[in-house]
UniProtKB/Swiss-Prot annotation:
It comes from Chromobacterium violaceum (strain ATCC 12472 / DSM 30191 / JCM 1249 / CCUG 213 / NBRC 12614 / NCIMB 9131 / NCTC 9757 / MK). Keywords: Ribonucleoprotein, Ribosomal protein, RNA-binding, rRNA-binding. Part of the 30S ribosomal subunit. Interacts with proteins S7 and S18. Binds to IF-3. This is Small ribosomal subunit protein uS11. Belongs to the universal ribosomal protein uS11 family. It holds the Pfam family Ribosomal_S11. The lineage of its organism: Bacteria, Pseudomonadati, Pseudomonadota, Betaproteobacteria, Neisseriales.
């Protein structure tokens, strides 16, 4: 009986080399989402406070945002990213700590901009909390 040819070619996924990227930090009151993209907006890596192992009210802490930024930054370093442009959106507590974590990983931060959407008297905000 003839042997079947079992040799299977496995191609390695080729990682594109990107020198500079954009970090989108979405800091809400409940969570922090960090996405690192290339110049065209294609996502290279992303991380969240909840995905970093924090649950409940601990997701909304600055330390959780720092850990999430380190996760996303380490994956982006595998793509060869050196320079980052930071765009921060939202009022959450993880805004500055995410940027500091990326800076401590050795990235050169070229610019930091706040892109929080501000309504020109749009929708009515929710009522004030009474505790």
């Amino acid at each position: 009986m003839a042997k079947a040819n079992t040799a299977v070619r496995v191609r390695k996924k080729v990682r594109k080399s990107v020198s500079e990227g954009i970090v989108h930090v979405h800091a809400s009151f409940n969570n922090t989402i960090i996405t690192i993209t290339d110049r065209q907006g294609n996502a290279l890596s992303w991380a969240t406070s909840g995905g970093a192992g924090f649950k409940g009210s601990r997701k909304s802490t600055p330390f959780a945002a720092q850990v999430a930024a380190e996760h996303a930054g380490k994956v982006a370093q595998e793509y060869g990213v050196k320079n980052l442009e930071v765009r921060i959106k939202g009022p959450g507590p993880g805004r500055e700590s995410a940027v500091r974590a990326l800076n401590s990983l050795g990235f050169k931060i070229t610019s930091i901009s706040d892109v929080t959407p501000v309504p020109h008297n749009g929708c009515r905000p929710p009522k004030k909390r009474r505790i």
